[in-house]
Structures are given as structure tokens and as C-alpha cells.
Amino acid sequence: HTRQDIEQILYFSRLGATHKDYSFESLSILGTCREAVEDNLTLLEEAGFSIEYTENDYQVISDKKGLMFILGQIISNSVKYVGNNLAPRLIFSIADSMNSEQISLSIKDNGTSIPLSDLPFVFDKGFTGDTGSYLSRSTGMGLYLVQKMATDLSITVELKNNSCGGTTVTLTFPKVERPFGR
């Protein structure tokens, strides 16, 4: 987890910078998800996760480093809060509303749900809640940084509990035809 802690520190300092060096480009959503899974493969394999992807893929305009950071934090949280699940899984699915100007990526796990009393605060700086087996490792910065990075990239982040346990994080991207300023 040391790499993840260092990444959080670097992104925290980057978010406070006056000039942000984002590089917006056309990205395959599922391709980027697969790359984030690959970057976290050891962590996922040690926890016994199975990974599923929907067949549909879409292109979005975003900053790859920023999006990879967001996905890495979400994956890390799924592993942290896997609970006693003997068959943990992550499901990446995409929804494109034809009459909407948005594309949504949902990342669903079947780990520990977030207590309803904690849900309103999960994106607050320093909030750790009282769930999970790695409580002593929680900094309360991961989802805070995810929210800040997502705001910078014009991505909306929503987190909700699943009815059968676990959580779903939904990233909603604006539909943009080409990178900004081009």
C-alpha cells in the first residue's frame, strides 16, 4: 500500500497547484479500466477477486493519469472493504443514455456495504468511518481525492450501497466529441 500512499500525496499536492498539467485525450473506458486492474493485479489476486467487464465500450475525453488515479482508489477500496467474502468480485459496466449527454461507468463490488450513517460523509477530507478490516490503514483521503480529481475532470462521482451487499461507484462523463481546446 506504500505506492498508493505516495500516489495520494502526489495527487493531493497536484490538486492544489495553480497550473494543472492535465492532458485530455480520447480514451477507451474499458481499456482504461483494464489497465487500472492490471496495475492493481497483485492486490486483487491476493484478495481472490474475479473481474467482469460488460461488452460495450465507449470513448470519453479525459486525462488518463487522473482517471487511472480515480480507478486505482476505487479498486483499492474494494479490496480494503472486502470483508469475509469468499468470492469477491468487481464488475465494470457502462451505460450510454442515447438521449443524454452523458456516459456512465459503474464499478460494483460485493464486499462490505457502507453504513447508511456514513454515506453522506465518504467524500469528506479525513473521514474514515468504522467499516473494514484495514481501519488502521485508512487515511480518509482516498475518496476525498477521488472527488476532487473527478471535479477537475468534469466527472460526477456517486457511491451507493447495493441491495445484496457491497457498493457501486458510478463515474459519469460528459459526452464530448474532441479534446478541449482543439
Residue ranges, per PLM feature:
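A conserved beta-strand-to-alpha-helix junction within the catalytic ATP-binding
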Residues: 23-38
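Short conserved segment of the HATPase_c
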Residues: 114-126
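Acidic ATP/Mg2+-coordinating residue in the GHKL
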Residues: 109
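Short helix-loop "hinge" at the ATP-lid/N-box region of the Bergerat-fold HATPase_c
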Residues: 78-82
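Conserved micro-motifs of the catalytic ATP-binding
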Residues: 17-22, 55, 59-63
